[in-house]
Design a protein with these regions (language model features):
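N-terminal low-structure segments adjacent to metalloprotease catalytic domains
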Residues: 1-4, 92
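Auxiliary, metal-adjacent structural segments of Zn-dependent hydrolase domains
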Residues: 4-62, 75-76
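Short pre-active-site segment immediately N-terminal to the catalytic Zn-binding motif
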Residues: 66-83
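Post-HEXXH active-site segment of zinc metalloproteases
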Residues: 77-78, 93-125
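Hydrophobic (often cysteine-bearing) scaffold residues that line and stabilize catalytic clefts
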Residues: 20, 24, 28, 80, ...
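Substrate-binding/catalytic groove segments of enzymes
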Residues: 91-103, 136-146
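Active-site recognition of the HExxH zinc-binding catalytic motif
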Residues: 81-94
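Long, well-structured alpha-helical subdomains associated
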Residues: 6-10, 14, 113-167
């Protein structure tokens, strides 16, 4: 069976929208796999699209997957940023489970008292900073937080090298 037949059979079984979704997911999954391997040293995490109420992306602990809001599937940079952000949250939890540093204790406390609407939490600033650094260095893409105040905090976090320190 050739690629054209596979595509036709898939579309007949699941519909053209699902095929298009797979074509969008492939480069995202490849990017996530690369970052897991080269930057975080963790096993790859599956990426899927679903209907989400508001977030661009979230990490599903039960499924061990990154769920992307299908409303954003045409905005590659936005969903790639969401993937990287959620990957960093996954890595933060691994870090917390395996380390007893001041940073691990702060992050643990922030996860235990998580406030979805407080974007100034260190775990959020760290995830945003990680995403922006990887987008720039690995993919040559620029993404800035839509809130200028939060972006200043992210820039300060990156400049301070806290992203690299175990303080």
């Amino acid at each position: 069976m050739n690629n054209k037949n596979i595509k036709e059979e898939f579309i007949n079984a699941f519909g053209e929208e699902k095929w298009n979704e797979l074509e969008i997911l492939k480069p995202l999954q490849d990017a996530v796999d690369l970052v897991c391997k080269e930057y975080l040293g963790i096993k790859p995490i599956p990426v899927v699209f679903e209907a989400l109420s508001e977030d661009v992306a979230r990490y599903d602990f039960k499924l061990q997957a990154i769920i992307l809001n299908n409303k954003y599937k045409d905005d590659y940079i936005e969903v790639l940023d969401g993937c990287l952000h959620e990957l960093e949250h996954h890595w933060q939890r691994i870090y917390i489970a395996n380390n007893d540093t001041p940073k691990a204790r702060r992050w643990k406390k922030e996860f235990e008292n998580y406030d979805k609407y407080n974007q100034t939490q260190e775990i959020e600033i760290d995830a945003c900073a990680f995403s922006q650094v990887i987008l720039s260095c690995e993919f040559g893409l620029t993404y800035k937080h839509p809130n200028n105040y939060i972006q200043v905090l992210i820039d300060d976090y990156i400049r301070s090298r806290k992203i690299l320190l175990d303080d």
